[in-house]
C-alpha cells in the first residue's frame, strides 16, 4: 500500500458549495482522470459538437506552473484540468500516506490544530470512483482510521458510471462514519454526453448497497428539451430502484454563466418538488480554482 503512487489535481480546504452539505467546512481531494468530458456545458447547442467553443484546448500553458494559475473556462467542463492530457504535467503524484497528510495540513490553522472534528471530507474529480481513485481513497481513509482521527462525514461527487469494486463496497459497509454519494448524471441536452455513456442506473443502484445516504444532482438549463430529458432520465433511475432525492443545479461554471438563467431554473425545479442547489463557492469567492 505504501508504495502506490496516485495522480490527483488538488487538495484544498473550503466549504461544500453544492447539494446537501452546502456550507459545511470541507476538505477536498480532486482526482485526475475522468471517463467523460462534458464539453457540451454552456454551449449554444450541447448536442452538436461541431459548434463547441472549448477555450481550454487553445489556452497557452507556457507561463503556467501550477493548476491554481488556470482560469475557470466559460464553456465545457469547469474542471477540464482534472482530466485533459494537456494538463497531465501539472498533476501531483504522491503515496496515499502523503496525500492523507497533505489533506490534514490543508485544514490545519490557528483555529484547528489538524483534527477532523466535524469537518466534512469530499472526494471529487475528475471522477473519484475510477479504479485508481477507489483504491486511493480506501488507503487514505485507512490511514486516518489507523491515526484514530478520521472524518465522520464523507462524500463522493461522482458521475454515476463507475462500478464499485467488491473490496470498496466492503470497506464502506464497515466504515464508522456516514458516507454520502452525490451522483450527478450528465444529460445529453446539457453536457453533450450520450445517454449510453452517461446514464447508468444499474451502476448507481449498486452504490445503494454501501452508501448511508445519496442524492441525484442534475445540471439543467432552462430549455424545454433538457427538462423533458430529465423526466425520462429520472424515471430510469426510479425503475432501477434508485429512490434518492433529486437536486437541480442551474448550468454555468462561472457566476456570470449561472446568472443567465439560475432563477428561472430554480423556479422550474421547486415547482416540480425538486431541491435546488447553487454553486455557493463561486458567489463567495468568484471564478477560482481551489475554492
Model-derived regions, located:
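Conserved acidic residues
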Residues: 11-14, 127, 159
Amino acid at each position: 500500500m505504501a508504495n502506490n503512487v496516485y495522480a490527483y489535481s488538488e487538495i484544498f480546504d473550503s466549504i461544500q458549495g453544492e447539494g446537501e452539505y452546502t456550507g459545511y467546512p470541507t476538505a477536498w481531494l480532486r482526482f485526475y482522470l475522468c471517463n467523460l468530458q462534458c464539453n457540451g456545458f454552456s454551449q449554444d447547442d450541447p448536442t452538436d459538437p461541431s459548434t463547441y467553443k472549448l477555450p481550454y484546448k487553445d489556452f497557452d500553458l507556457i507561463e503556467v506552473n501550477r493548476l491554481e494559475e488556470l482560469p475557470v473556462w466559460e464553456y465545457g467542463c469547469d474542471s477540464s484540468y482534472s482530466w485533459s492530457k494537456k494538463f497531465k504535467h501539472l498533476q501531483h503524484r504522491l503515496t496515499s500516506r502523503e496525500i492523507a497528510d497533505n489533506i490534514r495540513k490543508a485544514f490545519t490553522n490557528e483555529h484547528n490544530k489538524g483534527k477532523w472534528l466535524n469537518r466534512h471530507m469530499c472526494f471529487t474529480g475528475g471522477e473519484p470512483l475510477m479504479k485508481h481513485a477507489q483504491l486511493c481513497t480506501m488507503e487514505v481513509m485507512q490511514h486516518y482510521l489507523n491515526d484514530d482521527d478520521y472524518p465522520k462525514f464523507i462524500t463522493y461527487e461522482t458521475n454515476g458510471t463507475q462500478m464499485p469494486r467488491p473490496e470498496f463496497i466492503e470497506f464502506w459497509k464497515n466504515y464508522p462514519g456516514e458516507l454520502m454519494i452525490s451522483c450527478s448524471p450528465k444529460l445529453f441536452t446539457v453536457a453533450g454526453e450520450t445517454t449510453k455513456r452517461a446514464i447508468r442506473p444499474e451502476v448507481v443502484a449498486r452504490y445503494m448497497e454501501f452508501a448511508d445516504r445519496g442524492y441525484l444532482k442534475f445540471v439543467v438549463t432552462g430549455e424545454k428539451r433538457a427538462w423533458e430529458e430529465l423526466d425520462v432520465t429520472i424515471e430510469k433511475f426510479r425503475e432501477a430502484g434508485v429512490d434518492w432525492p433529486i437536486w437541480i443545479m442551474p448550468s454555468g461554471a462561472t457566476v456570470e454563466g449561472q446568472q443567465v438563467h439560475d432563477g428561472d431554473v430554480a423556479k422550474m425545479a421547486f415547482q416540480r418538488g425538486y431541491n435546488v442547489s447553487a454553486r455557493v463557492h463561486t458567489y463567495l469567492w468568484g471564478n477560482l480554482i481551489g475554492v
